[in-house]
């Protein structure tokens, strides 16, 4: 019996990355960021919502269900409003550069490759396959936008910007939940 318990504890420790045997608390990530880091975070958020604001253009080239069309329209409208508000906030002191994401070349290449594959999948699909591709790609984009806004809000010192980021987190989290619900109810087997 003792051997069995020891084996289970060892297996759990190995599978959990030995977190059970960790000797102390992990260091907390610094909440201090430079203006350059913060600006790059805002630029990433701006880039993300700028792409999301075009999601409703799919209806010009593809036929989608009314439910998907309405959902994509909500995402596009939320993203347009968010992009506009980001542009206004970027002009306030201290100003933000919404074009400098400062991503490494390999990250940029990976993102470009993913976008190219997703575009190809969307253009070549129809019906349920089209919907599933659109919904799954939106799911990851909305999740990223919500978490990026949340991370920026955690370090933002300007009250108006912090409030904007918290609203943005809530909006994109709600949209993410709506997309997830659609995906779960329509495509589970």
Located regions from the model:
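C-terminal motif of bacterial Sec signal peptides marking the signal peptidase cleavage site
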Residues: 14-17
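Bacterial N-terminal signal peptides that target proteins for export
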Residues: 1-7
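His/Met- and acidic-residue-enriched segments that coordinate or traffic transition-metal cofactors
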Residues: 19-189
